[in-house]
Amino acid sequence: MISYGEQLSSPAVSPPLVRAGLRGPMMHGATFAYVPSPQALHRIPGTSAYAFPSLSPVALTEHGCPYGEARERHEPLPAKLALEEEQKPESGWAQELRRTAMTLLKLPLMVTFLYLFVCSLDVLSSAFQLAGGKVAGDIFKDNAILANPVAGLVVGILVTVLVQSSSTATSIIVSMVSSGLLEVSSAIPIIMGSNIGTSVTNTIVALMQAGDRTDFRRAFAGATVHDCFNWLSVLVLLPLEAATGYLHHVTGLVVASFNIRGGRDAPDLLKTITEPFTKLIIQLDRSVITSIATGDESLRNHSLIRIWCHRDPVEASTSMARAETNISRTHGNATMEKCNHIFVDTQLPDLAVGLILLAGSLVLLCTCLILLVKMLNSLLKGQVAKVIQKVINTDLPAPFTWVTGYFAMVVGAAMTFIVQSSSVFTSAITPLVGLGVISIERAYPLTLGSNIGTTTTAILAALASPREKLSSSFQIALCHFFFNISGILLWYPLPCTRLPIRMAKALGKRTAKYRWFAVLYLLVCFLLLPSLVFGISMAGWRAMVGVGAPFGALLAFVVLINVLQSRSPGRLPKWLQTWDFLPHWMHSLQPLDHLITHATLCCSRSEPRSPQLPARVFLEELPPATPSPRLALPAHHNATRL
């Protein structure tokens, strides 16, 4: 029988046996092998403790097996949790009772933090509207600019990012169409832009999981799959709409075919729960933004902060001037009283109040999200996590496997209809994607269903319009609905067409390696690039074609070369099989990463090695019966003897 020591690359020397006063025969076993303890393993530079299914610590080093990918491939749970579970002694009934009580205590705390998380999103939206609501109204007011489809798309993105609410942006568009200030055909690109702008919220939420690279990679991929779907859909459907008027004609036929009657407002299911808390912080009069957008300058100097409210909550509230200081007053047949929120008597301008609320809501959002992730990480581990992962990510049995994704879309649409906000739903599932509970392949159809769910809310809201405005309002809501349906038909039915998943995974890997790339992505995709396109579109369509055509051709060439380099490099010339002929900064983010690292005074990515420790540690092959892999370490290292 081959001893353990003979299988090591460098033979281990057994220490001399200390003969004590023992009676009876002494048995000499095989040569001792060194297995580092978890404490010693953490002191080895460049290694990371990882648990295989046998829960034995193994050092994954520079031998071509990235730690994050290997951990996700073998075990979805963090190695630290698995090691803690292995080292935890068996508990009695008292410890079991204490653990159960702690679990029951965490559940109401999780519900509380989730409630505060949703409320912080509502306050965040109000903060953005205070800071940039009137600017958004001014942007909508220039009809000559909105007649350009590309400019209309950019306006939709910027306005939705400014007010952090696609519902507010859509209501402004519906009001402008209803009043005759904007044609339906000109409003369709703005609807597309608002669909892109609303996806910025869950991308911001994903930034809160930047502490762990593996979680951040999954969370950012799960958040940006929404962005990728919206951008790809716009790249196909916007030129199609500009050339043929596809959405305008289809929705016009639907409106003309049905005898549509006005209905009730969309149900406020989530707001009924959150408004008692958010109304104590701030209350806004959003009609000011709509009035500015429709050309009514009488409310130009009015504040968005609501001062006077109706006593009857069913009636619409009317905003009064801040100069009134009475506790109650009569307006027509309605008795009004002063609103009850923190900023009701403030003398600060709207911008200052908006910045205060922006900072406070971001702090509350980050705190709630971090605590939620920690509690989910403690609850969803071991067998519980495996069961939940299996239930959520498992497909239906054959031959109905293909139905699973569409069923997830129905679930996403229903949940979004209940909470009345796609941002809230997608922001809620983003931490679960980061923890690995929901796979990105399952998060993708849930997000598509969320897109559909938010359009059904807009349709119900359009049905509440007056009869003379019903037709145009309903047509705009249907344009939003058919835009998302068309995008699903383009990018979901066939597995080969699900490009948003592959694009999101590539973005996730990039941000896990360079975490500053996530902030750069947000600034470029939702602010700098739309602003640049908007500025070029102001110069006319000739400037758009002159700048956009060469840039589009260059982008298409780079994408084509990248695909050929990864799949069939032999078809390319030798000098084009890699991008090494270009300067390093043109095909790699490492120079920029080095610059940003030094500019922010961050520590270097590589840890200094001790001269007493080896540069590399390699795994050794073990017989199948051995429960714990071993490392070839020098004899002077502290190790646990087996």
UniProtKB/Swiss-Prot annotation:
Induction: Up-regulated by a low-phosphate diet. PANTHER family: SODIUM-DEPENDENT PHOSPHATE TRANSPORT PROTEIN 2A, SOLUTE CARRIER FAMILY 34 SODIUM PHOSPHATE , MEMBER 2-RELATED. Glycans are attached at N301, N326, N333. Belongs to the SLC34A transporter family. Keywords: Cell membrane, Disulfide bond, Glycoprotein, Ion transport, Membrane, Phosphoprotein, Sodium, Sodium transport, Symport, Transmembrane, Transmembrane helix, Transport. Residues 1-106, 167-168, 374-415, 491-516, 565-642 are cytoplasmic. The gene is SLC34A1. InterPro entries: Na/Pi_transpt. Transport activity is significantly increased in response to dietary phosphate deprivation. It holds the Pfam family Na_Pi_cotrans. GO terms for molecular function: sodium:phosphate symporter activity. It is a multi-pass membrane protein. This is Sodium-dependent phosphate transport protein 2A. GO terms for cellular component: apical plasma membrane; brush border; plasma membrane; vesicle. The modification Phosphothreonine is found at T511, T626.
